[in-house]
Swiss-Prot record:
Assembly notes: Homodimer.
Record bears the keyword DNA repair: no
Name of the protein: Protein GrpE
Example GO biological process: protein folding
Cysteines engaged in disulfide bonds, as pairs: none
Function: Participates actively in the response to hyperosmotic and heat shock by preventing the aggregation of stress-denatured proteins, in association with DnaK and GrpE. It is the nucleotide exchange factor for DnaK and may function as a thermosensor. Unfolded proteins bind initially to DnaJ; upon interaction with the DnaJ-bound protein, DnaK hydrolyzes its bound ATP, resulting in the formation of a stable complex. GrpE releases ADP from DnaK; ATP binding to DnaK triggers the release of the substrate protein, thus completing the reaction cycle.
Localization terms from the record: Cytoplasm
Alphabetized PANTHER family for the sequence: GRPE PROTEIN, GRPE PROTEIN HOMOLOG, MITOCHONDRIAL
Amino acid sequence: MSSKEQKTPEGQAPEEIIMDQHEEIEAVEPEASAEQVDPRDEKIANLEAQLAEAQTRERDGILRVKAEMENLRRRTELDIEKAHKFALEKFINELLPVIDSLDRALEVADKANPDMSAMVEGIELTLKSMLDVVRKFGVEVIAETNVPLDPNVHQAIAMVESDDVAPGNVLGIMQKGYTLNGRTIRAAMVTVAKAKD
């Protein structure tokens, strides 16, 4: 028998045994490399996770700051709007006694006397022009009667029995009230109707 013809006890040629062993080693190597994790890969994965977490925190922080800035901008706009709307409040409050004086002068003036007609007309025109000016700036007069009492714009001075006006409604105006852009700057002093006993 030659060396080529030599058979192993299992009946395989030596080349076949080497090939089989080589295939077994190749089959084992991928499993071994899958089980072995490179520490650099672990470190990279850990760093990537930390980076993602840091990016999320930064993104959240930026969004939070943007939201705070937007809220601050809105509040500032509202404050400026209110300042524009109600900047005249002090000035209007100083004018109200003048308007009241003109109203009282008209109430007590003797309109039947022809000698007083020019003065009454002058007071009426002065009052009208003053009210027109303050209306341009958002001031409205509260002087309606026979309307339900509204504690936001009326201050009840007295209750008076009445057949003509429903109970709880404004019967008379003692002093006119005023609003500035919808906000009451002086409530109207009124008498309120009540049912007769």
